[in-house]
Structures are given as C-alpha cells and as structure tokens.
Amino acid sequence: SKNSSCAGYASEELVEPLIFNQSARFMVVADPLDGSSNISVNMPIGTIFGIIRNTDYGVSSFNKSGRYYISAGYSLYGPSDIFVICVNNKVIEFTLDPEKKEYMLSRDDIKIPRTGSVYSINEGNFVSWEDNVKKWVLDNKNPTGSSNKRKTLRYVGSLVADAHRTL
C-alpha cells in the first residue's frame, strides 16, 4: 500500500528484488529458509533477515554495507523456536512458549563471547580459503604451547543454527 514503510524485498530465492513502494523508508532482505538441505535429516533450519534504510529509492538500496542496516536477526526452527533480533546495538532473544503461543524474552543483551571452545566452519571449502584462515583452523585442531587449548568443530550446514550455537 502507499502507506507501507516497506519499499521492497530481496532474497536469494528471487531473480530480481521486488519493489512495492519506492519512496518508503525501508528495504527488507531475507534468506527465508536457511539450511533447507537439513530438512530431510531433521536438523535445525531458520530464517535470516535484515532491514535497510532506503537511501537510493530503488534496487541499489539493497547493495549497502552493514551501517545502513537498522535491524537484523533470525528465527531458528528446531526443538524450540527462537527469534533473535538486533536493534539499537542490542541483541535480544525470544523463545516460543508452545502453551501460550507467544514468544517470551529468554536472553537480553547477548554478546558474542571473546573466546570459546567451539568453532564452526565448512571444512569442505578448505582449498579455497586464504592462508591465514587455513592456519587458524589448523592451529585450533593442533594447538602448540601451553596457552592454546584445542577447539572442537561443530558444523551442521545451517548458518542460523551454527551462529546461534556461537551466541
């Protein structure tokens, strides 16, 4: 509608972005079903989205760096349904309460840990990685020195599930 705040929508599922109202304030980008190859093996899948300021009033507004995003987030569908959103530099998580049929705040002001014992990467792409990435992965598998601890690889092939584990 002409009163809509959404100017358009882009997704890897579409050949071209959809423009609804070129003068509206925001554009939405999404991967509606991330990890869809995991459906047949009953692994978690999700939806990834971002909301961008409509600065160019057309398709070129989709080609913007992260500083133009006013919000981003994901939904994770699995044993529990989780919705995570970043607004005003704050990451908040909600979990679906199946009895109440509403999302309840489950974590507030989430931060990515500085260190951890787990990493997530698709090792099938090892040959195409830059040398510093290869070295980092190999160092995590075979640490040297007393300060380095071995890290564990966890990768399911769903960006949403893998990123959520990191958070």
Segments predicted by a language model, with ranges:
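IMPase-like, lithium-sensitive Mg2+-dependent phosphomonoesterase catalytic core
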Residues: 1-167
